[in-house]
Amino acid sequence: MTAPHTPSRRDETLGLWLGVLGVAIFAITLPATRLATGSAQAPQLSPWFVTVGRAALAGLLSAAFLLATRSPRPQQAQWKHLGWAVLGNVIGYPLLLGYALRSVTASHAAVVTALLPLVTAAVAALVLHQRARLGFWACAVLGSVLVVAFSLLRGGQQGHGFGFETADLLLVGAVVAASVGYIHGARVTPALGAERVICWMCLMALPFTLPAALWLWPAQPVAPSAWAGFVYVGVFSMWAGFFAWFRGLALGGALRVSQTQLLQPFFSILASIPLLGEPLDVVTLGFAAAVVATVVVGKKLS
């Protein structure tokens, strides 16, 4: 009888750094998407084009990877979960995020999307009928209250009155969409392998995303910075980042490496300073830290 494999110290260290790399890649998604779509005052690429275009780019890369590795096709029962993952992660999250980032800063979005790990756990509890402790739900409610308070505060500061911005509702929708996609993707990961799940998702969507991207190709000139943001979210956010992230989880252990997700909102805020010229806002940092704290405590109580 062989002993179960345990990661070596070297694997744990490499896995941790790969996890940090993956989180950093995902964190830059917010400012890169803002670069690609522009603002309401100076729009660049349409959110629909960015959504289908980034997925098409990742789909072409995925096709090459799956062919090169001679990956077997998913079984019939697995396509349903891949389809839900496509709707949540390939279409829903980037589309809602793209529209939201035309109205709010990337730093603002980082605070709202910091709830993603907690919402994912809540969706898992509801969809997979997993029981969670009362303390977990208390943290989920507290984290949601913090996000609501932040959104109301920002609305008042911008002269819109104390009420939700449409962008805040879009961001919440994006978080829910991503969470649903993550849960369904996770259900087929043990059988397919983590890297292949994202590849099959992108390839599954390619018959729709590639023609749609060509149809929606911008007719007007677009700033080079917008194209740079688009290429980033297609190559890195939608594809390469998952390779670093999943490999890090495998090498360093999912429990340990997944904690690096807590750095993501801070990486997003910091990346927005040089990429978008957004100021370092103490209030935004404070709310981000508070939301992350609810995620930390919530995970311990789940």
Language-model regions: role of each:
Residues 62, 123, 132-154, 271, ...:
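Hydrophobic transmembrane alpha-helices of multi-pass small-molecule transport proteins
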Residues 1-52, 158-187, 208:
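Glycine-/small-residue-enriched transmembrane alpha-helix faces in small-molecule transporters
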Residues 42-92, 119-123, 142, 176-184, ...:
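Transmembrane alpha-helices of multi-pass small-molecule transport proteins
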